[in-house]
A protein has these predicted regions:
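Class I S-adenosyl-L-methionine
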Residues: 1-136
């Protein structure tokens, strides 16, 4: 990644008792990963690429991976730096109770539009946790 100012790696969190887990995902301009399992393979259809609306935006796939590995449906998530809302989209998809804060009105409004566009496309197929429990 010598040609850009972006880091090759970002450490999200660690402690003294657990090992570091690496999430590999291509995220450089128009070169974006295909999926969680194939994050190192460039997505062929550029129309499926995420549009960046925030300078430190992370891919939704990163939060999908985090939530799949470290949460259960119905868990509560607090994001104090909401930014582009990628975590909110992934939390919605994972059935999490999500609260987010963003200090910038501009970025808050951008992520709100992004979230509304996402949910308007998926609401027909999305069940929230209480609806899932009703069907059990």
């Amino acid at each position: 990644n010598q040609a850009t100012s972006f880091s090759d790696c970002e450490l999200a969190a660690t402690d003294l008792f657990t090992t570091v887990r690496l999430f590999r995902y291509m995220w450089s301009g128009m070169m974006q990963g295909k999926s969680i399992k194939e994050g190192h393979i460039m997505q062929g259809n550029k129309k499926l690429n995420e549009v960046r609306i925030h300078p430190t935006q992370k891919p939704v796939a990163l939060y999908d991976w985090i939530f799949q590995n470290y949460t259960s449906p119905g868990d509560r998530v607090l994001d104090t730096h909401l930014g582009s809302g990628s975590s909110r989209i992934a939390g919605y998809s994972a059935g999490l109770e999500f609260t987010g804060f963003e200090i910038s009105a501009e970025y808050y409004n951008r992520q709100e539009r992004r979230f509304q566009e996402y949910t308007s496309q998926t609401d027909m197929f999305h069940l929230n946790l209480s609806e899932v429990k009703q069907h059990e």
